[in-house]
Amino acid sequence: AAILSDRDFLRDAPHSDLTERLNFLLPGKNPDSAFRIDRAALQRVKAAFRQLTDKTFSSEDLQYCGILPAKAYPDRIARARSPHSGEYVLSNGVTAKLRPDDDMRKHEFLCAPVVEGAGAVPTIYLSAELSLPELERHFPELIQEKTVAIWNNETNALNVFREKRL
């Protein structure tokens, strides 16, 4: 929550990966970053984090990096329009894009809690990877399953299959 509410402490970072930002909250770790760090913003995030929880944050907690913001912002669950395109359709129907050099574009599903920008397609500034099994487990209401039947002219046969859609 603190990372989402304050300005990004990783200045000039071309990627939106929430996991990298959470690494800065791990106890005893001061991860290296190739990007300029706004130390004051980082200290505010750390202070807010300490106020919100008495639990020690560990690297095992990073596995929930996509699920937790998706629970808070289910309308920001996103699926890539096409592989590696960087353009995503959010569950609220809005199309948003990652910046061109954002490594997060390799993921089919994301939670994009920070999306900003005016114009035709807003930009995703903060995102976390989600997997299809995570979505099926934690958000079954977003998965629609139906039977599809398509006639195949080449084989003169009816092909029937189950299709899942987010």
Regions found by a protein language model. Name each.
Residues A1-L166:
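Second RecA-like catalytic domain
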